[in-house]
């Protein structure tokens, strides 16, 4: 079979991702485009004659970049297409918005690259009384047009057949430009590098005349002739860029008049009716908060019901199973405990997180695909404008509920570097799925019937602190106003099950692989440091271990937030959590249960793997039956409690160590707000600079320590009023000094707002050699 590389390109909300998932299924690989941290998705699929590599390009409305303030997505798409890596392009077009989508189509066809138009969302178009003549559209465009309903898989086989039959586009003159424009474009094309095809040279010439700033990187000497060409054109027309765009829109209007009845189209009545409520200025925000709470409640509820299968099952396989192998093969006791507690305990920490995190990703994917997330950004626009940000900056922040890494990377969709940078600084405060696992454990141990409310309050606190961080930046080192907010609101539709499953699986797989490696390694090292003293002797009591000795020295620093000296395990959890937040649960589980594991006698004769696995399945089934009972719906944390006996096990020890719900909640505040995990730090450094990464770390530590201290000292004021008053005043005074210093430093850091463009500039410079892909 021949190998074929295809670029998949289209407008945002055209169904491009759904089509990508339909074609490639689970055969996907996610990486980054060279030079920038924009996500690059590739997938594999086969047709009758070809083995296809499908590259999912970022959604974009056009290939023209008028300003360096523009989104990175347009630049990446343009660079890839001009690199020549794609043998064929599939342009996904939204049939219900044909006129707007055809602007990108015309630009692609003018390039002369073989192209197939995938006319998607025909079901939505039909509901709006839109009729499109497919054959007439294909004839006018000079390329195949394949009707699709990607959410239902309709038209996929026809698209694969068109891929096998692909050929050069018919030589149809689509756009009738003014003759002076063509003359100047041809004159620029003559001095461009000869290895660029003639059609692409003329296209680049038109792009330069239109004001595209990145086409000059490909034009060679032609860029030196641009000013003279524009001067000659201005003697004959007012604005060359306007004439070019107008010629394209006239062509699009002529095509639509012939092939469709868009003038008699009817808007979606359902979408219009729902938007009157969802976008209401008074109801919009409460509805958004309710949707977020419902998402959290269902994730905790259903995920908690599935937890026994992963928890009890992993204990049977990786803890008791390893112990059985160790005793059967006569391993030394220390080795058996080390493997069971380190390796087995690490795996047992990762797997129980899967149901709740998976449910969270599933519901996020549902909200994104259904069209609600765009409405959430619109609802939050007024609040974001107060921060000097456009409403669409809230979209990457919402993604942070799943993971902060794509939240940071999602800032690339914003137009201005200042807006990107502010959003990046706010993103780490959004409570990710890994933090949810920590909150659920603490809620079950300390808050009982109020567990759901406690966890929801932490989610809201994260949003509030992100907003306050934005306000702080706006009035200190990042003064400025938001760009006008224009955003397309897609019609509501029911997401395709296959697409939801694939998106959830891709996110969950990345989480498990990333978290699993770190948790297991950390658990093994913690077990080792728990087994030896500072002098190198083996210890029977973890309180005499090297880890305990070192941690006790550091723990007094956290006394103001309610971590007592004998609770050194909590200090270790904070340090390991800097690697990955999910490691906090693994660390506390390993340390709080260490003594119990060492003291327990394991009888290999009584071990029955089948019986333990059956117990896990039975417990899961019972939990699922009870999941939607009224009592569980009112208190979803109980469904995921996982350790019913509070006097024994990790949760019992944790309850004793913290001593009060106030101390536990203060600890959770610190976990929510302090240092981002390593992967988020790396994303911040790549998207902005190391300096801004350092600022994010220091600001997060300050906010976490300050807020946790204020909460705990106010909550425990009656126990030690003098100490509490000193701590409160010290925190307030320190933050006044910090804000004052940031205001004075404003003039020194403005230049750094361009940091997000450095990697793009290098990518653009490398594009002529084909390296920007």
Curated annotation (Swiss-Prot):
Residues 303-308, 367-382, 448-452, 539-663, 712-721 are periplasmic. SUPFAM superfamilies: P-loop containing nucleoside triphosphate hydrolases. Keywords: Cell inner membrane, Cell membrane, GTP-binding, Ion transport, Iron, Iron transport, Membrane, Nucleotide-binding, Transmembrane, Transmembrane helix, Transport. GTP 2 binds at residues 35-39. Induction: Iron uptake is repressed by the global regulator Fur in presence of Fe(2+). Induced by hydroxyurea. Residues 1-274 are annotated as: NFeoB, GTPase protein domain, binds GTP but not ATP. It is found in: Cell inner membrane. GTP 1 binds at residues 10-17. Changing residue 150 to A: Dramatically reduced GDP release-rate, 5-fold increase in affinity for GDP, in construct of residues 1-270. GTP hydrolysis rate 1.5-fold higher than wild-type. GO terms for cellular component: plasma membrane. The keyword ATP-binding does not apply. GTP binds at residues 120-123, 149-151. This is Fe(2+) transporter FeoB. The lineage of its organism: Bacteria, Pseudomonadati, Pseudomonadota, Gammaproteobacteria, Enterobacterales.
